[in-house]
Amino acid sequence: MKPDAHHVKQFLLRLQDDICQTLSAVDGANFVEDSWRREAGGGGRSRVLRNGGIFEQAGVNFSHVHGDAMPASATAHRPELAGRSFEAMGVSLVVHPHNPYIPTSHANVRFFIAEKPGADPVWWFGGGFDLTPYYGFEEDAVHWHRTARDLCQPFGDDVYPRYKKWCDDYFFLKHRNEQRGIGGLFFDDLNTPDFDHCFAFMQAVGNGYTEAYLPIVERRKAMVWGERERNFQLYRRGRYVEFNLVWDRGTLFGLQTGGRTESILMSMPPLVRWEYDWQPEAGSPEAALSEFIQVRDWI
């Protein structure tokens, strides 16, 4: 089947609706929608839930941008895209909970297609999801990765280990020499064996996010926390900010190509703190995190 951008867009719009409805049902608060248009072509729907019962901030963004030509920064490494019209669409989300015992989660699924008359379209899918705990619980990590493995299984035995490794490699803070969290799945440039297969996998990843995350939220939401745990959560959120602003390709591409800044930075935590050369107390739960987020096989 030839690539069908309209079909992908309809799925992404439904996915945004489904995820927002699911998170609202768990939290009790509602998302506020901010629809926006891009002068050069396209637009999107940014939805944010603030100060809910469970989530301090959750942002779920849909965007669909298009144009007659790719920006030079995008074609420098992909000369085959020069002179083609393009469409790029996706859903991206980040959830920052109040409770430090609930991890932060991130997910993204996206589709890109570039076309010109008389030539085959250039297209691919990308996406994934990853988990950033502040306090490590092995059963949560096992559930997260088992859900990822199970959704990958119908697409081949090698899919989960390959995209798990890609996720571990991608969400790494080189300047800190540490992982951002415990990973999950990450894939990009997916266009084989055919459109239907790739689209089905992207849908499985998008639909699998809430199955992976919500049981962890339910398991941890009643745990009691205080100032110590909150301060550690805010400190570790600093790593999240550092990764997004220094290393994340999507954030950098969006800011460098005139994307909508409010939507791009929607992933940022609402509160964060840095402390010079802070070290956790030896033997404390906070000190245990650095070992917990080391790359390993969870299942």
Curated annotation (Swiss-Prot):
One of its GO terms (cellular component) is cytoplasm. Its cofactor is a divalent metal cation. Involved in the heme biosynthesis. Catalyzes the aerobic oxidative decarboxylation of propionate groups of rings A and B of coproporphyrinogen-III to yield the vinyl groups in protoporphyrinogen-IX. Pathway: Porphyrin-containing compound metabolism; protoporphyrin-IX biosynthesis; protoporphyrinogen-IX from coproporphyrinogen-III (O2 route): step 1/1. Homodimer. It catalyses: coproporphyrinogen III + O2 + 2 H(+) = protoporphyrinogen IX + 2 CO2 + 2 H2O. The gene is hemF. Residues 240-275 are annotated as: Important for dimerization. The active site is at H106. The lineage of its organism: Bacteria, Pseudomonadati, Pseudomonadota, Gammaproteobacteria, Enterobacterales. InterPro entries: Coprogen_oxidase_aer, Coprogen_oxidase_aer_sf, Coprogen_oxidase_CS. NCBIfam families: PRK05330.1 (NF003727). It comes from Salmonella newport (strain SL254). The keyword Calcium does not apply. This is Oxygen-dependent coproporphyrinogen-III oxidase.
